[in-house]
Amino acid sequence: MSIRKILQFPDYRLRLLSKPIKIINKKTKKIIYDMFDTMYANNGIGLAAPQINILKQIIVISSLKPTMSELVLINPVILKKNKKYINTIEGCLSIPKKTAKIKRSSCIKIQAINTYGKSFTLTAKSLLSICIQHEIDHLIGKLFIDYIN
């Protein structure tokens, strides 16, 4: 597969809205493979398609712990957010060398589609919850620095 160029802030394309995926075909799967290659080549734990200048609602997340598989989230939607928040230090492949303390929901429930076109729900806690929220923000043109007061 291919390693793609990651858009860097303040590139205006990072602020654009992504469109839902209608059909999962070979082209979609190639984008997903390229996203994983790009994420790992840049030592990331998550990547959203807009970061590689593809305005589609696709997110990939690495296996954050040995018992977890890699995740592909197509057209993800947050169904529920826990009212308990956690503050963590976040960074972003599109904003290198910058981190900030960000407040995120500690637990979320999402709905998404997998690479086989099947809808599923997932409850995510801790780091996975934070990572998913961060990547979903990319799909709506929002960056972690937007949360800094």
UniProtKB/Swiss-Prot annotation:
Give the annotated active site. Answer: E135
Which top-rank group of organisms is this from?
Answer: Bacteria
Which cofactors does this protein require? Fe(2+)
Report the Gene3D superfamilies cross-referenced here. Answer: Peptide deformylase (3.90.45.10)
E.C. no: 3.5.1.88
Q: What is stated as this protein's family in its record? A: Belongs to the polypeptide deformylase family.
- HAMAP family, alphabetically? Pep_deformylase
- Task of the protein: Removes the formyl group from the N-terminal Met of newly synthesized proteins. Requires at least a dipeptide for an efficient rate of reaction. N-terminal L-methionine is a prerequisite for activity but the enzyme has broad specificity at other positions.
Query: Under what name is this protein listed?
Result: Peptide deformylase
Q: Which organism is it from?
A: Buchnera aphidicola subsp. Cinara cedri (strain Cc)
